[in-house]
From Swiss-Prot:
The gene coding this protein: Arih2
Listed name of the protein: E3 ubiquitin-protein ligase ARIH2
Residues reported to bind Zn(2+) 2: C155, H157, C182, C187
Pathway entry: Protein modification; protein ubiquitination
Gene source species: Mus musculus
Extent of Acidic residues compositional bias: 12-36
Role, per record: E3 ubiquitin-protein ligase, which catalyzes ubiquitination of target proteins together with ubiquitin-conjugating enzyme E2 UBE2L3. Acts as an atypical E3 ubiquitin-protein ligase by working together with cullin-5-RING ubiquitin ligase complex (ECS complex, also named CRL5 complex) and initiating ubiquitination of ECS substrates: associates with ECS complex and specifically mediates addition of the first ubiquitin on ECS targets. The initial ubiquitin is then elongated. E3 ubiquitin-protein ligase activity is activated upon binding to neddylated form of the ECS complex.
Active-site feature positions: C309
Modification comment: Ubiquitinated. Ubiquitination promotes proteasomal degradation.
Transmembrane segments: none
Lineage: Eukaryota, Metazoa, Chordata, Craniata, Vertebrata
């Protein structure tokens, strides 16, 4: 939260929010079980302790390159021994079936020949087309070569060593690992690594090939993910692959295990991809909403937002208002935190295509503006965190307490960032959500979370005006709101 460039804020009006307050224009709905749930949510926040169930709890392990390689090697040697195949072929089979050994063994017992066909290490007898070229003839360079210089996979499509070398070298230079396949048209067979390595002309290419193979092995493994951090060699291992938050213990990168993108709960992986693509396509929208200034709705003075809190106070007239909707903050909380909920036009389906297009744009802008606003608030609150850190250092240096005495201030700023990050990703979720009782429940929880986050942000930015107990109580409420929303809606 902030005001004009020279202003400081004062205490907020922190009123309780009435979940049953609805706009008069909206149709009256039978609340049914939802109203009971609203009451339950409010009581849950007060009853749950700090050790309450965390819906984001997720067990994972960070592995080094050597540890990952060792785990992969163990799977490979075990499978090769059971199936009586080479280590290279065993790896191709494992890649094709995402390293799920039990499934591979079941398929092998059921139909071993079909397993090898599906893994692309043996040709399909019903579809295999043998070479039509004369003996000792390379089908690529069209040259006659000595028999010992002709090489082929299990498909028996023969090509000269020189053509194989060029084929493999070009693909490795292009970043291909496991994906190197037979040169014959429409032949799906993949080349085992023990076939490729002797064909690479120098150690530099062989080193690249090893890296690409390792990358492909990890990416195909259902329990492993490469850390997306810059130049980070770590691998994350889990027991159950899900769209959950993981953090590398080497570079501290935080990401979604399932899609390796920025963590995005409660929005699922497919939805966040759609949303980010849409935002990128509508780049002009970002320019339209990029302004950091708005006019005070009471005295019209230009106000700059240089803090994360959306509770604004004009330095000139002391009017308290919401940055997002410009509504009076005194009544803001009593109106179901309305500015977080989009009011759709129920008659839009009966209107013209142009009207529907305008409504679609209006809806998108509503959600995008809030998404972008919370992103900016996170950046501004990161600066607040640094100021708190510096202030604590100054107090400790002046013998005004120890780090332990003031640690709660940093904890509050960290929790604020955690809660606001979750809130930011509720907007893509709501944008794509179908209208109905479940969306109304989601919007209620979203509004409750947003209200408590703004209360926490206000207090963090004015920590000297609040005692420790008040701040920690607000932290507890905000975190429980966040956990309640994720428990009910982060189900991927």
């Amino acid at each position: 939260m902030s005001v004009d460039m020279n202003s400081q804020g004062s205490d907020s009006n922190e009123e309780d929010y009435d979940p049953n307050c609805e706009e008069e224009e909206e149709e009256e709905e039978d609340p049914g079980d939802i109203e009971d749930y609203y009451v339950g949510v409010a009581s849950d926040v007060e009853q749950q302790g700090a050790d309450a169930f965390d819906p984001e709890e997720y067990q994972f392990t960070c592995l080094t390159y050597k540890e990952s390689e060792g785990a992969l090697h163990e799977h490979m040697t075990s499978l090769a021994s059971v199936l009586k195949v080479s280590h290279s072929v065993a790896k191709l089979i494992l890649v094709n079936f995402h390293w799920q050994v039990s499934e591979i063994l079941d398929r092998y017992r059921s139909n071993s020949a079909q397993l090898l066909v599906e893994a692309r290490v043996q040709p399909n007898p019903s579809k295999h087309v043998p070479t039509a070229h004369p003996p000792h003839h390379c089908a690529v360079c069209m040259q006659f070569v000595r028999k010992e210089n002709l090489l082929s996979l299990a498909c028996q499509h023969q090509f000269c060593r020189s053509c194989w070398e060029q084929h493999c070298s070009v693909l490795v230079k292009d970043g291909v690992g496991v994906g190197i396949s037979c040169m014959a048209q429409d032949c799906p067979l993949r080349t085992p690594e023990d076939f490729v390595f002797p064909l690479l002309p120098n150690e530099e290419l062989r080193d690249k090939y090893r890296r690409y193979l390792f990358r492909d092995y990890v990416e195909s493994h259902f329990q492993l993910q490469l850390c997306p951090g810059a130049d980070c060699p770590m691998v994350i291992r889990v027991q159950e692959p899900r769209a959950r938050r993981v953090q590398c213990n080497r570079c501290s990168e935080v990401f979604c295990f399932k899609c390796r993108q920025m963590y995005h709960a409660p929005t699922d992986c497919a939805t966040i991809r759609k949303w980010l693509t849409k935002c990128a396509d509508d780049s002009e929208t970002a320019n339209y909403i990029s302004a950091h200034t708005k006019d005070c709705p009471k005295c019209n003075i230009c106000i700059e937002k240089n803090g994360g809190c959306n509770h604004m106070q004009c330095s000139k007239c002391k009017h308290d208002f919401c940055w997002m909707c410009l509504g009076d903050w005194k009544t803001h909380g009593s109106e179901y935190y309305e500015c977080s909920r989009y009011k759709e036009n129920p008659d839009i389906v009966n209107q013209s295509q142009q009207a529907q297009a305008r409504e679609a744009l209006k809806k998108y802008l509503f959600y995008f503006e809030r998404w972008e606003n919370h992103n900016k608030s996170l950046q501004l609150e990161a600066q607040t965190y640094e100021r708190i850190h510096e202030k604590i250092q100054e107090r400790v240096m002046n013998n005004l307490g120890t780090w332990i005495d003031w640690q709660y201030l940093q904890n509050a700023a960290k929790l604020l960032a955690k809660c606001r990050y979750t809130l930011q990703y509720t907007y893509p979720y709501a944008y794509y959500m179908e209208s109905g009782p479940r969306k109304k429940l989601f919007e209620y929880q979203q509004a409750q979370l947003e209200a408590e986050i703004e209360n926490l942000s206000w207090k963090v930015e004015r920590a000297d005006s609040y005692d420790r107990g008040d701040l920690e109580n607000q932290m507890h409420i905000a975190e429980q709101r966040r956990r309640t929303l994720l428990k009910d809606f982060h189900d991927t």
